[in-house]
Amino acid sequence: MATFHFDLVSPEKLAFSGEVDQVDVPGIEGDFGVLANHAPVVAVIRPGILTVITGGNQQKIVVLGGIAEVSEKGLTVLADVATSVADLDAAMFAQTVSSMESALAGKQGSELDRAIERLDHYKNIQHQLTATAMH
């Protein structure tokens, strides 16, 4: 399988840089997979789990929003936060979800709608993490 260059950058660090076979990205308009020679695209990413596939191995990384750009140079993801699933503190993540639920009471209108949408994304990540841990 042909490879391409992938960079995952967050404000704290360069979370990943290297040649990969495929990257599955949680897009705001739907998840999408990137392979070598993918058409150029810029997409907003939602909070979710980004999957990097190299030589049959998968690495899962939690991203909490950002931008993905596919160009002739490869794929670059600028993520608000990027944490490997292996390094994620599940208890702290659960506490964040709980705090987000509590904060809903003080919101209304479009602010409430955005908070519910973000909470749904976080709960989906939490569900995927729980399902992964069981296997």
UniProtKB/Swiss-Prot annotation:
Matching InterPro entries: ATP_synth_F1_dsu/esu, ATP_synth_F1_dsu/esu_N, ATPsynth_dsu/esu_N
Recorded GO MF terms: ATP binding; proton-transporting ATP synthase activity, rotational mechanism
Membrane protein topology class: Peripheral membrane protein
Keywords in alphabetical order: ATP synthesis, Cell inner membrane, Cell membrane, CF(1), Hydrogen ion transport, Ion transport, Membrane, Transport
Database matches in Gene3D superfamilies: F0F1 ATP synthase delta/epsilon subunit, N-terminal (2.60.15.10)
Top-rank taxon: Bacteria
HAMAP family found in the cross-reference section: ATP_synth_epsil_bac
Family as reported in the entry's similarity comment: Belongs to the ATPase epsilon chain family.
Subunit note: F-type ATPases have 2 components, CF(1) - the catalytic core - and CF(0) - the membrane proton channel. CF(1) has five subunits: alpha(3), beta(3), gamma(1), delta(1), epsilon(1). CF(0) has three main subunits: a, b and c.
Function: Produces ATP from ADP in the presence of a proton gradient across the membrane.
UniProt name for this protein: ATP synthase epsilon chain
Lineage: Bacteria, Pseudomonadati, Pseudomonadota, Alphaproteobacteria, Hyphomicrobiales
